[in-house]
Every structure is written in C-alpha cells, then in structure tokens.
C-alpha cells in the first residue's frame, strides 16, 4: 500500500522497518549505483526464482545507493529511539513514584561503612571513580564487584569526603555488604529534575546491561538467567496480574518500568558490533566513510 509492503511473520516477535534495497532479498532492476531509482511498474518477483524484486508502487532511491552518512543516520536511529522511548517511560515512572537518590538512610553496626565513618544522610557520589546518581547505582556496583576494595567519595553537609573500605561477606544475606541501607524514593522537585533523573534511570539500565554482558562473557551467570521472548512475555503477564489489585496506575507504572528495561537493553544489544545487528552494519558503514569507498 502506497509503495510499502507489509508482512506478518509466522512468529511475530519484535518488528522491523526496512528501506527499499536494504534487504538482501530484493534485487534492483539494473545497476544500483548512487542515484539509481525504482521502477514503479517492477513486478514483485522475477518470475523465475523466489528472489524478491520491488514492491508494487515503490519509488525512490535504493538504500545502498545513498551516501554512507545517510545510511549511518538511518541505521543508528533505531537504537537511539530505543533509548528515547526508555527516557519517556522513565519520565512517566519518576513523575508518579519519584526516584531513589544515592543517599544513606542508615548504617549498620560492625560493618565496613560504620568503621569508615559513613553516617545517615551522607550522599555517595562515586565508587572507585564511577559516578553514582541512584541508590541502585551503589547496589549494582557492589554486586558486580563483590569483595573488592572500594574508594567511596561522599558528601556530608555540602562538604566532600573520601574513604576506603572492603565489603564484608554476610552469611545471612549471602553476599558482600558494606552495611548501609537506602533506596527511599523522593518526589522530584521540578520538571527539570524529573527529566534529569529520567536520564539517570536510562543510564542505570544501560550500565546494568553492559555489566551483565560482561558477566555472561566471563561465565559468571548461567543460560537459565537469560530471558528469551517467551519468558519476557510471561514476566509481563505476571507483572500485570500481580499489580491489578493495586489499581490501574500501578499496573501502568510497572509496565513502564519493564519498558525501560527492555528498551534500554534492546538499544545496547542492537549497537553491539555483530554482523546481524545494527552495530555490525554501523561498523562497515564507518569503515566505508573512513576509506571513502565501499
């Protein structure tokens, strides 16, 4: 319709939008040099093979015939809009329930944090130089670096301090702890602060995705911990079912949280330099731009 060919796959997981000539299954009529265009009367197949030609009514320039810079912008737009969608979902969630600043609510006796001088009300700014905006940043950093010495930069009454500690293993918790608690959500003071912490939320999930990929490569997690499409759909269904008793708004907030996670994860995965993904195609386009030729 209108020069666009629509299709529904047997397994409708995910989706895609391809420019004319972007799919290797399409054959161009004649040469596909820069500036070549489509023949509106070209049939859908060549009549001899199953190779696809142009959709009826398609006009314009082939994807591979335009400049490398134009193709770069088209390919990178997909992952970028994954991150933009994640940001909008984060904006909705934070507007409804607030955010969790990296502030210490309490310090447990006998743990490294108390011994190093941390107090309730302190705000942790960096762990080994890594900036922390959310309390979850603190939690995940310690989770991904168990038992390792950590330099903590924190703020108290407007003044910056630095201390060092080594997380201690807790038999009760089954993991390494420094002995602090936090994660109390706070409503944003303004629209600007909501937008700011929406960015930090997306940043958090991007960092978690990269850290998780590192754990997979190091074989620190099993294949059972990796969720495929079926498991993701099941998780969404479970989330909706468990949230229904709390009202529609809680259901929407939980679904938006899932959307942040999935969109940020998909954006990162698509940028990986693997041939079948957008990242792999970007590598070849960048090489073409550097060389000045395909």
Enumerate the language-model features and the residues they cover.
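Membrane-embedded helix-turn/re-entrant segments that form the catalytic/gating core
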Residues: 1-89, 186-189, 194, 285, ...
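Functional transmembrane alpha-helices
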Residues: 53-69, 167-266, 283-294
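Hydrophobic membrane-targeting alpha-helices
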Residues: 88-96, 267-271
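Alpha-helical transmembrane signal-anchor/signal-peptide segments
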Residues: 97-114, 119
């Amino acid at each position: 319709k209108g020069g666009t060919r629509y299709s529904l796959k047997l397994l409708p997981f995910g989706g895609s939008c391809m420019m004319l000539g972007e799919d290797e299954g399409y054959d161009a009529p004649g040469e596909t040099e820069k500036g070549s265009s489509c023949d509106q009367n070209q049939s859908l197949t060549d009549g001899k093979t199953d190779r696809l030609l142009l959709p009826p009514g398609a006009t314009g320039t082939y994807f591979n015939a335009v400049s490398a810079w134009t193709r770069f912008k088209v390919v990178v737009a997909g992952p970028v809009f994954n991150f933009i969608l994640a940001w909008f979902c984060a904006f909705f969630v934070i507007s409804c329930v607030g955010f969790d600043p990296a502030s210490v609510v309490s310090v447990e006796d006998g743990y490294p944090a108390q011994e190093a001088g941390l107090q309730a009300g302190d705000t942790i700014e960096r762990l080994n130089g890594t900036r922390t905006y959310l309390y979850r940043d603190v939690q995940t950093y310690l989770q991904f670096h168990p038992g390792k010495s950590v330099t903590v930069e924190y703020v108290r009454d407007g003044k910056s301090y630095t201390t060092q500690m080594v997380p201690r293993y807790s038999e009760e918790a089954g993991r390494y702890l420094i002995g602090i608690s936090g994660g109390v959500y706070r409503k944003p003071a303004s629209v600007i602060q909501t937008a700011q912490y929406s960015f930090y939320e997306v940043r958090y999930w991007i960092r978690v995705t990269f850290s998780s990929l590192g754990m997979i490569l190091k074989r620190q997690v099993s294949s059972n911990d990796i969720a495929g499409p079926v498991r993701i759909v099941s998780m969404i269904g479970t989330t909706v079912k468990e949230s229904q008793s709390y009202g529609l708004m809680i259901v929407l907030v939980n679904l938006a949280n899932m959307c942040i996670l999935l969109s940020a994860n998909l954006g990162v995965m698509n940028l990986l330099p693997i041939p079948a993904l957008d990242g792999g195609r970007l590598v070849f386009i960048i090489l073409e731009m550097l060389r000045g030729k395909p």
